[in-house]
Amino acid sequence: MVQASGHRRSTRGSKMVSWSVIAKIQEILQRKMVREFLAEFMSTYVMMVFGLGSVAHMVLNKKYGSYLGVNLGFGFGVTMGVHVAGRISGAHMNAAVTFANCALGRVPWRKFPVYVLGQFLGSFLAAATIYSLFYTAILHFSGGQLMVTGPVATAGIFATYLPDHMTLWRGFLNEAWLTGMLQLCLFAITDQENNPALPGTEALVIGILVVIIGVSLGMNTGYAINPSRDLPPRIFTFIAGWGKQVFSNGENWWWVPVVAPLLGAYLGGIIYLVFIGSTIPREPLKLEDSVAYEDHGITVLPKMGSHEPTISPLTPVSVSPANRSSVHPAPPLHESMALEHF
Protein backbone atom coordinates (compact mmCIF):
# COMPACT_ATOMS: atom_id res chain seq x y z
CA MET A 1 0.00 0.00 0.00
CA VAL A 2 2.76 2.36 0.94
CA GLN A 3 4.60 1.55 -2.26
CA ALA A 4 1.47 2.08 -4.37
CA SER A 5 0.76 5.42 -2.69
CA GLY A 6 4.34 6.53 -3.27
CA HIS A 7 4.10 5.48 -6.91
CA ARG A 8 0.92 7.54 -7.40
CA ARG A 9 2.54 10.61 -5.82
CA SER A 10 5.59 10.13 -8.05
CA THR A 11 3.37 9.88 -11.14
CA ARG A 12 1.43 13.02 -10.20
CA GLY A 13 4.68 14.86 -9.56
CA SER A 14 6.13 13.85 -12.92
CA LYS A 15 2.94 14.94 -14.68
CA MET A 16 3.09 18.34 -12.97
CA VAL A 17 6.70 18.76 -14.04
CA SER A 18 5.80 17.76 -17.61
CA TRP A 19 2.94 20.24 -17.79
CA SER A 20 5.17 22.92 -16.31
CA VAL A 21 7.79 22.31 -18.99
CA ILE A 22 5.15 22.33 -21.74
CA ALA A 23 3.67 25.58 -20.42
CA LYS A 24 7.12 27.15 -20.33
CA ILE A 25 7.82 26.08 -23.92
CA GLN A 26 4.46 27.46 -25.05
CA GLU A 27 5.21 30.74 -23.30
CA ILE A 28 8.54 31.01 -25.12
CA LEU A 29 7.01 30.14 -28.49
CA GLN A 30 4.36 32.84 -28.07
CA ARG A 31 6.95 35.59 -27.87
CA LYS A 32 6.77 37.76 -30.94
CA MET A 33 10.42 37.54 -31.95
CA VAL A 34 10.47 33.78 -31.47
CA ARG A 35 7.34 33.39 -33.60
CA GLU A 36 8.89 35.52 -36.34
CA PHE A 37 12.10 33.48 -36.22
CA LEU A 38 10.16 30.23 -36.55
CA ALA A 39 8.03 31.73 -39.32
CA GLU A 40 11.09 32.65 -41.38
CA PHE A 41 12.61 29.25 -40.66
CA MET A 42 9.55 27.28 -41.77
CA SER A 43 8.64 29.43 -44.78
CA THR A 44 12.21 29.31 -46.10
CA TYR A 45 12.34 25.57 -45.53
CA VAL A 46 9.14 25.06 -47.52
CA MET A 47 10.32 27.30 -50.38
CA MET A 48 13.72 25.62 -50.58
CA VAL A 49 12.45 22.04 -50.43
CA PHE A 50 10.18 22.65 -53.42
CA GLY A 51 12.81 24.69 -55.26
CA LEU A 52 15.80 22.41 -54.74
CA GLY A 53 13.65 19.36 -55.39
CA SER A 54 12.71 20.72 -58.79
CA VAL A 55 16.40 21.34 -59.59
CA ALA A 56 17.21 17.77 -58.55
CA HIS A 57 14.64 16.47 -61.03
CA MET A 58 16.13 18.54 -63.85
CA VAL A 59 19.74 17.54 -63.11
CA LEU A 60 19.27 13.87 -62.31
CA ASN A 61 16.64 12.86 -64.84
CA LYS A 62 15.53 15.02 -67.77
CA LYS A 63 12.46 12.82 -68.09
CA TYR A 64 11.05 14.21 -64.85
CA GLY A 65 12.44 17.73 -64.76
CA SER A 66 13.06 20.80 -66.91
CA TYR A 67 14.17 24.43 -66.61
CA LEU A 68 10.53 25.50 -66.64
CA GLY A 69 9.90 23.03 -63.85
CA VAL A 70 12.67 24.64 -61.79
CA ASN A 71 11.08 28.07 -62.20
CA LEU A 72 7.67 26.73 -61.26
CA GLY A 73 9.14 24.89 -58.28
CA PHE A 74 10.80 27.99 -56.87
CA GLY A 75 7.93 30.30 -57.80
CA PHE A 76 5.17 28.28 -56.22
CA GLY A 77 7.52 27.31 -53.40
CA VAL A 78 7.62 31.02 -52.62
CA THR A 79 3.82 31.12 -52.78
CA MET A 80 3.54 28.28 -50.27
CA GLY A 81 6.13 29.94 -48.05
CA VAL A 82 4.11 33.15 -47.99
CA HIS A 83 1.03 31.19 -46.96
CA VAL A 84 3.03 29.54 -44.17
CA ALA A 85 4.36 32.74 -42.60
CA GLY A 86 2.79 35.78 -44.26
CA ARG A 87 0.72 36.75 -41.22
CA ILE A 88 3.55 36.27 -38.74
CA SER A 89 6.80 37.64 -40.14
CA GLY A 90 5.81 38.75 -43.63
CA ALA A 91 7.58 35.68 -45.07
CA HIS A 92 10.69 37.39 -46.36
CA MET A 93 12.57 34.11 -47.05
CA ASN A 94 15.31 36.31 -48.49
CA ALA A 95 18.11 38.06 -46.61
CA ALA A 96 18.37 40.70 -49.35
CA VAL A 97 14.71 41.64 -48.95
CA THR A 98 15.09 41.77 -45.18
CA PHE A 99 18.17 43.97 -45.58
CA ALA A 100 16.40 46.36 -47.96
CA ASN A 101 13.39 46.71 -45.66
CA CYS A 102 15.64 47.39 -42.67
CA ALA A 103 17.78 49.88 -44.60
CA LEU A 104 14.67 51.70 -45.84
CA GLY A 105 13.10 51.89 -42.39
CA ARG A 106 10.29 49.41 -42.87
CA VAL A 107 11.64 46.79 -40.46
CA PRO A 108 13.66 47.46 -37.27
CA TRP A 109 17.32 46.52 -37.55
CA ARG A 110 17.04 44.40 -34.40
CA LYS A 111 15.00 41.90 -36.44
CA PHE A 112 17.61 41.52 -39.17
CA PRO A 113 19.79 38.87 -37.45
CA VAL A 114 16.72 37.00 -36.21
CA TYR A 115 15.12 36.82 -39.65
CA VAL A 116 18.35 35.94 -41.46
CA LEU A 117 19.26 33.24 -38.94
CA GLY A 118 15.84 31.66 -39.38
CA GLN A 119 16.17 31.82 -43.16
CA PHE A 120 19.68 30.33 -43.17
CA LEU A 121 18.74 27.46 -40.87
CA GLY A 122 15.61 26.68 -42.89
CA SER A 123 17.57 26.72 -46.14
CA PHE A 124 20.34 24.54 -44.71
CA LEU A 125 17.83 21.99 -43.42
CA ALA A 126 16.06 21.98 -46.79
CA ALA A 127 19.37 21.18 -48.52
CA ALA A 128 19.94 18.33 -46.07
CA THR A 129 16.41 17.07 -46.75
CA ILE A 130 16.87 17.04 -50.53
CA TYR A 131 20.26 15.36 -50.15
CA SER A 132 18.67 12.62 -48.05
CA LEU A 133 15.73 12.12 -50.40
CA PHE A 134 17.83 12.03 -53.57
CA TYR A 135 21.01 10.46 -52.15
CA THR A 136 20.88 7.24 -54.17
CA ALA A 137 19.83 9.09 -57.33
CA ILE A 138 22.77 11.49 -56.93
CA LEU A 139 25.27 8.65 -56.53
CA HIS A 140 23.76 6.70 -59.41
CA PHE A 141 23.87 9.72 -61.72
CA SER A 142 27.46 10.67 -60.85
CA GLY A 143 28.91 7.18 -60.54
CA GLY A 144 29.47 7.55 -56.82
CA GLN A 145 31.41 10.84 -57.15
CA LEU A 146 30.27 14.15 -55.73
CA MET A 147 31.32 16.53 -58.51
CA VAL A 148 31.12 20.33 -58.75
CA THR A 149 31.93 20.58 -62.48
CA GLY A 150 31.71 18.32 -65.49
CA PRO A 151 28.98 16.29 -67.18
CA VAL A 152 27.98 14.52 -63.96
CA ALA A 153 28.19 17.56 -61.66
CA THR A 154 25.58 17.55 -58.92
CA ALA A 155 26.60 20.51 -56.74
CA GLY A 156 24.37 22.70 -58.92
CA ILE A 157 21.35 21.01 -57.38
CA PHE A 158 21.98 23.02 -54.23
CA ALA A 159 23.65 26.31 -55.20
CA THR A 160 24.33 28.46 -58.26
CA TYR A 161 27.62 28.43 -60.18
CA LEU A 162 29.08 30.85 -62.72
CA PRO A 163 28.68 29.50 -66.29
CA ASP A 164 31.51 29.62 -68.82
CA HIS A 165 30.02 32.47 -70.85
CA MET A 166 29.90 34.86 -67.84
CA THR A 167 32.65 36.79 -66.08
CA LEU A 168 32.61 37.36 -62.34
CA TRP A 169 31.70 41.04 -62.50
CA ARG A 170 29.09 40.58 -65.21
CA GLY A 171 27.58 37.96 -62.97
CA PHE A 172 27.65 40.41 -60.06
CA LEU A 173 25.80 43.05 -62.07
CA ASN A 174 23.33 40.43 -63.29
CA GLU A 175 22.49 39.27 -59.75
CA ALA A 176 22.23 42.84 -58.45
CA TRP A 177 19.96 43.90 -61.29
CA LEU A 178 17.63 40.89 -61.02
CA THR A 179 17.28 41.36 -57.27
CA GLY A 180 16.56 45.04 -57.83
CA MET A 181 13.76 44.09 -60.21
CA LEU A 182 12.44 41.67 -57.60
CA GLN A 183 12.37 44.28 -54.84
CA LEU A 184 10.91 46.99 -57.05
CA CYS A 185 8.05 44.72 -58.10
CA LEU A 186 7.47 43.56 -54.53
CA PHE A 187 6.99 47.14 -53.40
CA ALA A 188 4.58 47.69 -56.31
CA ILE A 189 2.58 44.55 -55.53
CA THR A 190 2.05 45.62 -51.92
CA ASP A 191 1.71 49.41 -52.30
CA GLN A 192 -1.87 50.12 -51.24
CA GLU A 193 -1.73 53.60 -52.78
CA ASN A 194 -0.78 52.31 -56.23
CA ASN A 195 -2.21 49.21 -57.91
CA PRO A 196 -1.61 46.36 -55.44
CA ALA A 197 -2.50 42.71 -55.82
CA LEU A 198 -6.05 41.88 -54.83
CA PRO A 199 -6.43 40.96 -51.16
CA GLY A 200 -5.68 37.28 -50.72
CA THR A 201 -3.78 36.95 -54.01
CA GLU A 202 -0.47 38.47 -52.90
CA ALA A 203 1.19 35.09 -52.34
CA LEU A 204 0.23 33.86 -55.81
CA VAL A 205 1.29 37.08 -57.52
CA ILE A 206 4.68 37.04 -55.80
CA GLY A 207 5.19 33.44 -56.85
CA ILE A 208 4.36 34.37 -60.44
CA LEU A 209 6.88 37.22 -60.19
CA VAL A 210 9.64 34.74 -59.29
CA VAL A 211 8.62 32.50 -62.20
CA ILE A 212 8.74 35.46 -64.61
CA ILE A 213 12.22 36.46 -63.45
CA GLY A 214 13.42 32.90 -63.93
CA VAL A 215 11.99 32.21 -67.37
CA SER A 216 12.99 35.59 -68.80
CA LEU A 217 16.26 36.52 -67.08
CA GLY A 218 17.55 33.51 -65.16
CA MET A 219 19.87 31.91 -67.72
CA ASN A 220 23.06 33.86 -67.03
CA THR A 221 23.61 33.08 -63.36
CA GLY A 222 20.75 30.83 -62.29
CA TYR A 223 19.11 33.84 -60.59
CA ALA A 224 19.99 33.18 -56.96
CA ILE A 225 18.70 36.70 -56.08
CA ASN A 226 18.74 35.58 -52.46
CA PRO A 227 21.67 34.99 -50.08
CA SER A 228 19.44 32.71 -48.00
CA ARG A 229 18.78 30.54 -51.04
CA ASP A 230 22.44 30.14 -52.08
CA LEU A 231 24.89 30.28 -49.17
CA PRO A 232 23.41 27.76 -46.66
CA PRO A 233 23.03 24.96 -49.26
CA ARG A 234 26.56 25.71 -50.50
CA ILE A 235 27.86 25.30 -46.96
CA PHE A 236 25.94 22.03 -46.73
CA THR A 237 27.55 20.68 -49.91
CA PHE A 238 30.97 21.54 -48.50
CA ILE A 239 30.18 19.56 -45.35
CA ALA A 240 28.54 16.69 -47.26
CA GLY A 241 31.61 15.94 -49.36
CA TRP A 242 31.68 18.12 -52.47
CA GLY A 243 34.77 19.82 -51.07
CA LYS A 244 36.20 23.33 -51.11
CA GLN A 245 35.60 23.66 -54.86
CA VAL A 246 32.04 24.73 -54.03
CA PHE A 247 33.63 28.02 -52.89
CA SER A 248 36.59 28.33 -55.27
CA ASN A 249 34.79 27.47 -58.50
CA GLY A 250 34.08 30.32 -60.93
CA GLU A 251 36.74 32.71 -59.64
CA ASN A 252 35.42 32.32 -56.08
CA TRP A 253 31.87 32.97 -57.23
CA TRP A 254 30.33 32.04 -53.87
CA TRP A 255 30.32 35.59 -52.45
CA VAL A 256 28.51 37.16 -55.41
CA PRO A 257 25.05 35.62 -54.67
CA VAL A 258 25.49 36.92 -51.12
CA VAL A 259 26.63 40.51 -51.71
CA ALA A 260 25.07 41.43 -55.07
CA PRO A 261 21.45 40.75 -54.00
CA LEU A 262 21.88 42.97 -50.92
CA LEU A 263 22.97 45.88 -53.09
CA GLY A 264 20.36 45.17 -55.75
CA ALA A 265 17.42 44.91 -53.35
CA TYR A 266 18.39 48.17 -51.66
CA LEU A 267 18.70 50.05 -54.95
CA GLY A 268 15.49 48.53 -56.31
CA GLY A 269 13.60 49.65 -53.22
CA ILE A 270 15.00 53.18 -53.46
CA ILE A 271 14.14 53.42 -57.16
CA TYR A 272 10.52 52.45 -56.50
CA LEU A 273 10.11 54.81 -53.55
CA VAL A 274 11.69 57.77 -55.36
CA PHE A 275 10.32 57.40 -58.89
CA ILE A 276 6.94 55.81 -58.15
CA GLY A 277 6.12 56.06 -54.46
CA SER A 278 6.88 59.76 -54.17
CA THR A 279 4.82 60.66 -57.26
CA ILE A 280 1.58 59.02 -56.12
CA PRO A 281 -0.89 61.56 -54.64
CA ARG A 282 -1.63 60.44 -51.10
CA GLU A 283 -4.37 61.80 -48.88
CA PRO A 284 -3.18 63.19 -45.54
CA LEU A 285 -3.61 60.77 -42.68
CA LYS A 286 -6.23 62.24 -40.33
CA LEU A 287 -4.73 61.69 -36.93
CA GLU A 288 -5.56 64.29 -34.34
CA ASP A 289 -3.15 63.03 -31.72
CA SER A 290 0.45 62.86 -32.88
CA VAL A 291 1.51 61.32 -29.57
CA ALA A 292 -0.97 58.50 -30.03
CA TYR A 293 0.30 58.08 -33.60
CA GLU A 294 3.80 57.45 -32.34
CA ASP A 295 2.89 55.40 -29.30
CA HIS A 296 0.42 52.99 -30.86
CA GLY A 297 2.40 51.95 -33.90
CA ILE A 298 -0.03 53.18 -36.53
CA THR A 299 1.37 52.48 -39.95
CA VAL A 300 0.55 54.54 -43.01
CA LEU A 301 1.16 51.62 -45.36
CA PRO A 302 -0.98 48.83 -43.86
CA LYS A 303 0.83 45.64 -43.06
CA MET A 304 -0.35 42.37 -41.65
CA GLY A 305 0.70 40.91 -38.36
CA SER A 306 3.13 43.63 -37.32
CA HIS A 307 2.52 46.50 -34.94
CA GLU A 308 5.97 48.04 -35.15
CA PRO A 309 5.87 51.82 -35.65
CA THR A 310 6.49 52.24 -39.35
CA ILE A 311 6.00 55.75 -40.73
CA SER A 312 6.68 56.26 -44.42
CA PRO A 313 8.72 59.39 -45.18
CA LEU A 314 6.77 59.66 -48.42
CA THR A 315 3.36 60.00 -46.77
CA PRO A 316 2.21 63.43 -45.53
CA VAL A 317 0.59 63.39 -42.10
CA SER A 318 -1.90 66.06 -41.05
CA VAL A 319 -1.90 66.68 -37.31
CA SER A 320 -4.22 69.12 -35.58
CA PRO A 321 -3.81 69.85 -31.86
CA ALA A 322 -7.34 71.22 -31.55
CA ASN A 323 -9.04 68.15 -30.10
CA ARG A 324 -6.17 66.24 -28.47
CA SER A 325 -8.15 65.21 -25.39
CA SER A 326 -11.25 63.97 -27.20
CA VAL A 327 -9.77 61.83 -29.91
CA HIS A 328 -9.09 58.14 -29.49
CA PRO A 329 -6.10 56.69 -31.34
CA ALA A 330 -6.92 54.77 -34.47
CA PRO A 331 -6.21 51.03 -34.35
CA PRO A 332 -3.48 49.48 -36.49
CA LEU A 333 -4.54 48.75 -40.03
CA HIS A 334 -4.77 45.13 -41.17
CA GLU A 335 -6.37 45.26 -44.59
CA SER A 336 -3.37 43.96 -46.48
CA MET A 337 -0.54 41.50 -46.07
CA ALA A 338 2.89 42.55 -44.85
CA LEU A 339 4.42 41.41 -48.10
CA GLU A 340 6.23 44.65 -48.70
CA HIS A 341 8.62 42.82 -46.41
CA PHE A 342 9.08 39.90 -48.77
UniProtKB/Swiss-Prot annotation:
What organism is the protein native to?
Answer: Homo sapiens
- PTM comment text: Phosphorylation by PKA could prevent the interaction with PLIN1.
Summarize the protein's role: Aquaglyceroporins form homotetrameric transmembrane channels, with each monomer independently mediating glycerol and water transport across the plasma membrane along their osmotic gradient. Could also be permeable to urea. Mediates the efflux of glycerol, formed upon triglyceride hydrolysis, to avoid its accumulation in adipocytes and to make it available to other tissues. In the kidney, mediates the reabsorption of glycerol, preventing its loss in urine, again participating to energy homeostasis.
* SUPFAM superfamilies noted in UniProt: Aquaporin-like (SSF81338)
Q: Where is this site: Selectivity filter?
A: F74, Y223, R229
Among Gene3D superfamilies, the record links this protein to: Glycerol uptake facilitator protein
Q: Which reactions fall under this protein's catalytic activity?
A: glycerol(in) = glycerol(out); H2O(in) = H2O(out); urea(in) = urea(out)
What domain of life is recorded for the organism? Eukaryota
Q: What is known of its domains?
A: Aquaporins contain two tandem repeats each containing three membrane-spanning domains and a pore-forming loop with the signature motif Asn-Pro/Ala-Ala/Ser (NPA).
The residue spans the entry assigns to the Extracellular side of the membrane are as follows 55-67, 133-170, 218-221, 236-253
Q: Which residues lie within the membrane without crossing it?
A: 90-103, 222-235
Pinpoint motif NPA 1 by residue range: 94-96
Give the protein's recorded name. Aquaporin-7
Q: Which key words are in the record? A: Cell membrane, Cytoplasmic vesicle, Lipid droplet, Membrane, Phosphoprotein, Repeat, Transmembrane, Transmembrane helix, Transport
Q: Which InterPro entries match?
A: Aquaporin-like (IPR023271), MIP (IPR000425), MIP/Aquaporin (IPR050363)
Q: Where is this motif: NPA 2?
A: 226-228
Q: What transmembrane ranges does the database entry give?
A: 37-54, 68-85, 112-132, 171-188, 201-217, 254-275
Q: Which GO terms describe its biological process?
A: glycerol transmembrane transport; water transport
Task: Tell me which residues are marked as the site Important for permeability to glycerol.
Answer: Y135
